[in-house]
């Protein structure tokens, strides 16, 4: 029987030694970001994504082994555990197989078969299964089992009871069910019908559809599930019943006997009454799990891209949270996100105070030197954008605007966290501030919102919420630790995603900072309540201190590697203070062969390469490689769009069937997966990510339905 280590190694294409090392590191309490960044020699350089996949498989396989142990114990206590059954259970690689093998030994509620057994009909059922009786009349052999006044008072009723026992035994046989499961997966189709064929719904494209289980796209599965849940669709998994019964007959009927007809009837009943409904439920569950797993993957990828967007540093921002009746909330922020001023203006109906709004905004531009206006994309966004664009057109001041996604802003502004951060501000002003800060530092602001609320996925509310939360939390942790965190300015929300730091410890760090002043040395973290040695090991390298006592504290070099880093600087002839002046761009050239130097210093080559890269450009932010934010000075109208028009836009969402792109009109346009590239694209994420700036061509405009079709492939002349 393969070990957990060898199973994972084979599945993920790793060596058993690598897997064993990672498991040991995880069991010692090391986090995935820490292992990925600071234990490359031990793991062979496995990245954080692969490490999380390994961790997930480890958790599943350990749960599987625990379930096997429970099942073996339960069957053994019944005195029914054979060597063959033990071997089959121990060899099982999925939970479903374990449950199939355990099914005959589970306690059952009263069934037709159990009632027949209680009536003493099992010996007759065994005769049917044995197929050894070649002469005689089945009814004559059944007659002695008949009991007057019972449910089995005739030979026919007795034979029915025997068939019920056989049918249940076949349905409980793991090997028969496995064979039929394979047939179902290969041949079954999912059929969809309307509950009311005359009703027009968003699901009418699925009315009367039929598609093989193995080929139906994941997004379609989720759409059909939602339609069924809303009472608009009827869904059925259909398998060729004749083929399934024939397969089961072939497996069960081995020789001629007087019970052949009874056995055939039991086989057909077993499949149609017991096995088929169970397999239909199972296949629907498998389809849903497959679709949800893929949707969670897409959601996680989109969330990672959104969190990794380039910050707009040095911008003084006027943030607008549009609305109609209650007006448009305005927050003015300095380049560090500090609130300078706030008010409410009414550029939209019913007041439509365009002149007053423009005077207020122009005053903020003059008074505070604001150079960017941020507009939320919610209700009233379009009208507000027109007012802002008109203001920009009539001013000589360098000023531009951009649209930001409001998703989750209301969740944050009404949260306990927001009320603790800004107790004197109302909910709406907090929301406007959040929009402005999303531009200045998307990561620092978006971590304050539950990642499920960010809204960059498909059917997120229909997904397994525990699995979604686990995946998204992992993504946020990966991005936060990849970027690094300023220990002296980070919020508790941001600190809580740092490797090794829990939410309570994050609050303790902030409290310590408020009581004792700014951190000047990473070692001060050891004085924070409940931040122990293991937590310090896991978090220290990801927390940066600008202007501290040791210049290395402002880098991603881990304190355990300070001796090696200091020696590298010495051999390069560089003082540590050079790190505060932008680093040492030519340090790699000064050092020569890094491999030889690593051996000389007694550190691993991967670790030394990371140290050298960090000394070249200390505190480098990987988000600087992301596309720049697209700013506008004028508004584009839906009616301006024409087929063939070339535009620049920003990817707002990526789903299984394509990507939605903001091209500066109220409605995002859709680039279908077939229009993403002039080659086959298996999934849109191969080509685009959320936040990407892309060139698109308009291929269609449906003004009645408000839909825009785009292509990233230029039409051939």
Annotate each PLM feature.
Residues 74, 88, 99-102, 227-242, ...:
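Structured, non-catalytic alpha/beta "coupling" segments that mediate domain-domain communication
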Residues 4, 56, 62-80, 90, ...:
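Long, highly charged, low-complexity intrinsically disordered interaction regions
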Residues 50-53, 60, 64-319, 323-424, ...:
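Duplex nucleic acid-engaging cores and interfaces of nucleic-acid transaction enzymes
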Residues 1-20, 27:
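Generic start-of-chain signal for non-secretory N-termini
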Residues 182-189, 320-324, 378-380, 404-411, ...:
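A glycine-rich phosphate-binding loop feature that marks nucleotide/adenosyl-phosphate handling sites
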Residues 548-549, 553-717:
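Single-stranded RNA-binding regions, centering on S1/OB-family and related RNA-binding modules
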